[in-house]
């Protein structure tokens, strides 16, 4: 048991990193829940249209996350070594890469919205106005595109701020943006205090405003402070990046980018498969994912913490300490997720009642929530394994165990059950989630083998049984 329980210094380190992230993520997801509830009060079609668009934007978001994460791996290890020039170059790389993705995403989403949204609309279940759902989704998407530039630059900055230990600025900027989003959602969705009643368009406008508030605060907090971080100085004097470093980031980061892109596409394909069970399925999945995200903040926060802690230790060549912390971080993540899983299981029958939708959709959503509640500890372990292996630069392995697994196993199971059997949504969803047990077993094996113990900046690899510095 000692392998899984840390000392006071361990928990102090984790708390210092995790608590600001947890607060930011919890507040953000809670307000997203309120945002979703406000749209959900308009009606099932509006809620479903917005949900489909957010699923499409999810792919874009994960591409940014994967692209910036590749540079972030180097940023974490550069920070561990005290190399400010290296961090500056990784931030430049992030800005250029995220900008490129944003241009591509904007063009694609603007050109074929009917095709993309329509792929999720199928006649089944108790019905629903598919034409209205499509119209609401297009209205929402058209406005959301204006917020992508701010979101892209925020992502580029925040990924580096976090790996250098500056969690407070992103947290403060995020909370301010959340407040703006919540206030303008209320004013513009329902037309309060003299503002026009814009429905889903109001929700989109509020989100876009919040994106620019967040980016403005991030920019002011990094460049406008009296003593900006050393790596910020001279950031925009040029955009040159050493060729060997750019090549390293591309080689190590490309699998991570491809992984995030194909994983997000895989998750979108899962939703598309489930959508053949009708608009009720889309609505129930939206309610489930929105409530689940509030509880997933523990998993996401611990994952980021694992990546930062392990990445910094590997960069500082403290390999034995990294090995010691690995099982402790995974155990802490699993325990915390099990605790919140119990809460989710208990509230599952009541949370869907907050939405203005049918009893059938509420029942479906409650069943999906209970499946997710039971599986939370499993997801926590696989997530901790993913971030540990990623911190060591083993991005090809994370790609195989994450996105390839999603397509080969999860999507295949969902497609067969939905298209080749008459299995209801809940049973199909259960079988797809049970496949996560296979991924957890693979992750544990990879962690125990110690293949992640390596310094990607120096290229040093440490044998599984050897001693580090």
Describe the role of every protein-language-model region:
Residues 1-18, 75-147, 195-254, 310-375, ...:
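Short alpha-helical transmembrane segments in multi-pass integral membrane proteins
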Residues 5-37, 41-42, 58-70, 74, ...:
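N-terminal transmembrane alpha-helices
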Residues 16-35, 143, 177, 210-214, ...:
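Transmembrane helical elements of multi-pass membrane transporters/channels
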Residues 26, 30-48, 117-131, 189-198, ...:
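Helix-terminus/linker motif at the lipid-water interface of multi-pass membrane proteins
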Residues 33-37, 156-160, 183-190, 219, ...:
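Alpha-helical transmembrane segments of multipass membrane proteins
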Residues 44-55, 137, 141, 204, ...:
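Small-residue hotspots at the loop-to-helix junctions and early N-terminal turns
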Residues 47-107, 151-170, 271, 284-348, ...:
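Small-residue-rich hydrophobic transmembrane alpha-helices
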Residues 68, 143-162, 170-178, 203-218, ...:
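Short runs within selected transmembrane alpha-helices of multi-pass transporters and secretion channels
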